[in-house]
Amino acid sequence: MKKMKAIRNYAPQDIRYEEVDIQQPGDNEVLVRIQAALTCGTDVKTFRRGHPVLIKKTPSGFGHEFAGIVEQVGNNVVDFKPGDRVVAANSAPCGKCFYCLKKQYNLCENLDLLNGAYAEFITVPERIVQKNLLKIPTGLSFEKAAFAEPLANVVHGVERTGIQPGDTVGVVGIGPIGLMFARLAKLKGANVIAAGRNPLKLKLAKDFANADEVIDLKKYQH
């Protein structure tokens, strides 16, 4: 069996760079060659203290935000072929449980989860192939495409808030999600106030998100 390099999660604060078998795609699965992988805040938390939902059994793959190129497809896969540029969400709902029937898919009781983006290859399971594996548009880089899942959360949040031109929006906490939210709120025509503590992120709130006002919360600590 062919091998690959991968980062494996063994326990909180115990990750290892190892050589492991490449998992061949089964029926309805897709093998992707990783081109870009991000570090999510959840990855940092998982490294520090574990995650009972995202990683239920160790050792396991690690990392879940990625983009890449289809290397191989399993039997019955018709929507993707080797060479396709793709990005995937790290989960897919079952479509059958109490919450899915109410279209509250984020609360699905039987989520299919995917870890293992910190590797040369990742095998995307059937349900995620069917629901949340997407082709990357021409001209969009792998690095930017890998933001699809966190950006989708931001878009959903902006839609739920019903932001209108001229509204004033406060964003407290300007990590990647907060910065993207502030940027989209500006694109919706809102006046944006961004508040945080990190000097670099405060600068990004101005330069990237184009916030109208940036507040350094450290100035108000007692």
Stretches found by the model and what they are:
Residues 168-171, 186-222:
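Adenosine-nucleotide cofactor-binding segment
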Residues 94-172:
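NAD(P)H dinucleotide-binding glycine-rich loop of Rossmann-like/cofactor-binding domains
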Residues 179-182:
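Residues forming the Rossmann-fold NAD(P)(H) cofactor-binding site
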Residues 5, 29-31, 168:
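Residues that mark the start of a beta-strand
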Residues 10, 21-22, 57-63, 110-116, ...:
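Short Gly/Pro-enriched turn/cap motifs at secondary-structure boundaries
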